[in-house]
Curated annotation (Swiss-Prot):
GO terms for molecular function: 3'-5'-RNA exonuclease activity; magnesium ion binding; polyribonucleotide nucleotidyltransferase activity; RNA binding. It comes from Yersinia enterocolitica serotype O:8 / biotype 1B (strain NCTC 13174 / 8081). It catalyses: RNA(n+1) + phosphate = RNA(n) + a ribonucleoside 5'-diphosphate. Component of the RNA degradosome, which is a multiprotein complex involved in RNA processing and mRNA degradation. Residues 553-612 form the KH domain. This is Polyribonucleotide nucleotidyltransferase. GO terms for cellular component: cytosol. Mg(2+) binds at residues 486, 492. Involved in mRNA degradation. Catalyzes the phosphorolysis of single-stranded polyribonucleotides processively in the 3'- to 5'-direction. Its cofactor is Mg(2+). Belongs to the polyribonucleotide nucleotidyltransferase family. Residues 622-690 form the S1 motif domain. Disulfide bonds: none annotated.
């Protein structure tokens, strides 16, 4: 008899249920977590032994959405789920980031977390549910894990923080922030904001962390009731004698190497020192393990860099703690792109382009939460040459997808609305050099490229990456961190925004004990750095260009009676196809009668507008039109008039005398004046040639069919 153990609690406006012991009993641990009909099944499997020679912690997190969760069948050819979507990849990273620092440093056993969305309420995003599930499953598993963690989404509506807002509430929110952490510390923040102040952002982080304590308390209670025994795992004892010997041989030399400001030269010197020390020690004692020596060298290297920062000495590249690397900002660097910029900050460089397209270029995204269209795309590419390496080039990896989304969050708040700027915009950031903070360089480059393209963004935005080195109560916050400072430090803290406030905030914290005071210092220091960068950017381009590129499509908007849409489209799309071929434009029609005409040539667009006006013009009875014979039948002829509308000239209306054969008077393609004598209820048009040729007849209408 399967007997589940269930924990249920109120979490803000939602009810959360955590259930274990019912499913996947061969996994190390498994839980089903639900929040108001959104349910995620999370499993954890950990290997009891590490693989021989394992040098890193092999943690994998897979978040996967099943379409049956929303009562749908996949639309793919094979009618089953395929490779992870961008959203699934981002949520996998969201789960990975706060749990990874909570495993012991020397724990190298393989661990896999799989979160499967099995039921979805469109109002409840599964990501928070999956985070809670991963925390609960790891805590129940007995695997060495310094959790549990809680997770919360925070909105900001009517100047009030809202815990776990629904999908509809998020549409009204000026903030979408996810925070995760243990009982005593924030570990991860991911957010986008509509230009909020530093205090408002910090308040949201603290609010979310306080509110998620109920999650941690309930997971602890569940572990007390159903948790598996803790693994009998102990870290390998540190060889203190070897550590001292390595430090004696390497510390001073590594200290000198870390005074070399150029990255590649520094890396070459550090590698040479490590090779020399390893070789020397193995020559003295060939029973030593080279891998262990390398690990200790890494630890010594970290101690050297961190201790110098804490003593207030200059950083690796000679800067003070709050200094920004040298900036070089250029726009319009590529002649045929719609907008381009080259942003360089020290040894980090991004070549960023902006491309304008029409509504049909927008991305249609079919998600579990529903379908949507995205008219602002930002893609980030990190080729291996950017760090002087060789490697695979192909589809974007998890890191590239995550960095691209962060850069997009930084820019999204200043993008114009579709009514203000009816273009699809694609920004691509090519990282050509990297030594820290390439995602924030992408934010700066995106802002510049958009202004160069003439996109009327509300304000320029810039991004900065902050770091932290902390020992006991002593801490130093670093501005514009290098790659090494990111790797050897305790926090990666990225902030993007305009002069007026923050648009995106991302934090990844590797240690506990990050207080509100430390986060406040980091945010204020980041603001100073952001304003400095914006000042330099404004010297290159301070406002969006007054006009878009000559190579970009120009979009003209007109409005017609919605009842006339069928006339513009024509049977099977025949009219609109003929129009686009004839005018060389792209034409998009919306349900409310709005028509968008895109063309690189203004004259072509005007021609298309004129033709649409002809097609949608009301046919006036008793008016004379210039027409063209399109079909001849026994009882008369069909004649196209204004805008391609077709009417019938009955055989009795061709001439004043009796007509025996229509072809005696008319030929296919012949142009003739006709008078509208009736439009019936079905819209059928009766025409007359003989009334159009009477002495008192008016001249044909000038806007007749061409």
């Amino acid at each position: 008899m399967l007997t589940p153990i269930i924990r249920k609690f109120q979490y803000g406006q939602h009810t959360v249920t955590i259930e274990t012991g019912m499913m996947a009993r061969q996994a190390t641990a498994a839980v089903m977590v639900s929040m108001d009909d959104t349910a995620v099944f999370v499993t954890v499997v950990g290997q009891k032994k590490a693989k021989p020679g394992q040098s890193f912690f092999p943690l994998t997190v897979n978040y996967q959405e099943r379409t049956y969760a929303a009562g749908r069948i996949p639309g793919s050819f094979f009618r089953r789920e395929g490779r992870p979507s961008e959203g699934e990849t981002l949520t996998s990273r969201l789960i990975d980031r706060p749990i990874r620092p909570l495993f012991p440093d020397s724990f190298l056993n393989e661990v896999q977390v799989i979160a499967t969305v099995v039921s979805v309420n469109p109002q409840i995003n599964p990501d928070i549910v999956a985070l809670i599930g991963a925390s609960a499953a790891l805590s129940l598993s007995g695997i060495p894990f310094n959790g549990p963690i809680g997770a919360a989404r925070v909105g900001f509506i009517n100047d009030q923080y809202v815990l776990n807002p629904t999908t509809d509430e998020l549409k009204e929110s000026r903030l979408d922030l996810v925070v995760a952490g243990t009982a005593g510390a924030v570990l991860m923040v991911e957010s986008e904001a509509d230009i909020l102040s530093e205090d408002q952002m910090l308040g949201a982080v603290v609010f979310g962390h306080e509110q998620q304590q109920v999650v941690i308390e309930n997971i602890n209670a569940l572990v007390a009731e159903a948790g598996k025994p803790k693994w009998d795992w102990h870290a390998e004892p540190v060889n203190e004698a070897l550590h001292a010997r390595v430090a004696e041989l390497a510390a001073a030399r590594l200290g000198d190497a870390y005074r070399i400001t150029e990255k590649q030269e520094r890396y070459t010197q550090v590698d040479a020192i490590k090779a020399d020390v390893t070789e020397a020690l193995l020559a003295q004692d060939d029973t030593l393990d080279a891998a262990e020596i390398q690990d200790i060298l890494g630890s010594v290297e970290k101690d050297v860099v961190r201790s110098r920062v804490l003593r207030g000495e200059p950083r690796i590249d000679g800067r003070e703690k709050d200094m920004i690397r040298g900036l070089d900002v250029r726009t319009g660097v590529l002649p045929r792109t719609h907008g381009s910029a080259l942003f360089t900050r020290g040894e980090t460089q991004a070549l960023v382009t902006a491309t304008l397209g029409t509504a049909r270029d927008a991305q249609n995204i079919d998600e579990l939460m529903g379908e949507r269209t995205d008219s602002f795309l930002l893609h980030y590419n990190f080729p291996p040459y950017s760090v002087g390496e060789t490697g695979m080039v192909g589809s974007p990896k998890r890191r590239e997808i995550g960095h691209g989304r962060l850069a997009k969050r930084g820019v999204l708040a200043v993008m114009p609305s579709p009514s203000e700027f009816p273009y699809t915009v694609r920004v691509v950031s090519e990282i050509t050099e990297s030594n820290g903070s390439s995602s924030m360089a992408s934010v700066c480059g995106a802002s510049l490229a958009l202004m160069d393209a003439g996109v009327p963004i509300k304000a320029a935005v810039a991004g900065i990456a902050m770091g932290l080195v902390k020992e006991d109560e002593n801490f130093v916050v670093l501005s514009d961190i290098l790659g090494d400072e990111d790797h050897l430090g305790d926090m990666d803290f990225k902030v993007a925004g305009s002069r007026d406030g923050i648009t995106a905030l991302q934090m990844d914290i590797k240690i506990e004990g990050i207080t509100r005071e430390i986060m406040q210092v980091a945010l204020n220091q980041a603001k100073g750095a952001r304003l400095h960068i914006l000042g330099v950017m404004e010297q290159a381009i301070s406002t969006p260009r007054g006009d878009i590129s000559e190579f970009a499509p120009r979009i003209y908007t007109m409005k017609i009676n919605p009842e006339k849409i069928k006339d513009v489209i024509g049977k099977g799309g025949s009219v609109i196809r003929a129009l686009t071929d004839e005018t060389g434009t792209t034409i998009e029609i919306e349900d409310d009668g709005t028509i968008k005409i895109a063309a690189t040539d203004g004259d072509k667009a005007k021609h298309a507008i004129r033709r649409i006006e002809e097609i949608t013009a009301e046919i006036e009875v008793n008016r004379i039109y210039a027409g063209k014979v399109t079909r001849i039948v026994d009882f008369g002829a069909f004649v196209a008039i204004g805008g391609g509308k077709e009417g019938l000239v009955h055989i009795s209306q061709i001439a004043d005398k009796r007509v025996d054969k229509v072809t005696d008077y008319l030929q296919m393609g012949q142009e003739v004046p006709v008078k509208v004598i009736e439009v019936d209820r079905q819209g059928r048009i009766r025409l007359s040639m003989k009334e159009a040729t009477t002495p008192d007849a008016e001249a044909p209408a000038p806007e007749a069919a061409e």
